[in-house]
């Protein structure tokens, strides 16, 4: 299952990141790494971005980026 499929308020564990080296590096700097617990806080009106929370850090991801993050509930 991919991160962009989670509903608002749901949590899951990141199991893999299928992204370019540059995007993986960016994700790593935000704490988006294998084993991290991610919570979906909200979606934008057009559902082009989503706000997620990992630990105490909130961030916005494009749907295209969230499609590259595999999760397990």
Locations of the language-model features?
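Residue-level recognition of beta-strand microenvironments
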Residues: 17, 30, 41-43
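C-terminal structural segments of small proteins and small subunits
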Residues: 42-73
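Conserved hydrophobic positions within beta-strands
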Residues: 14, 37-40
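Short alpha-helix capping/helix-loop boundary micro-motifs
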Residues: 23-26
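Absolute protein N-terminus
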Residues: 1-2, 73
């Amino acid at each position: 299952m991919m991160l962009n499929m989670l509903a608002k308020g749901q949590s899951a564990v990141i199991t893999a990141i299928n992204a370019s080296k540059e995007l993986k590096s960016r994700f790593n700097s935000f704490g988006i790494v294998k084993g991290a617990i991610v919570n979906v806080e909200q979606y934008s009106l057009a559902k082009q971005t989503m706000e997620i929370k990992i630990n105490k850090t909130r961030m916005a991801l494009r749907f295209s980026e969230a499609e590259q993050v595999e999760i397990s509930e």
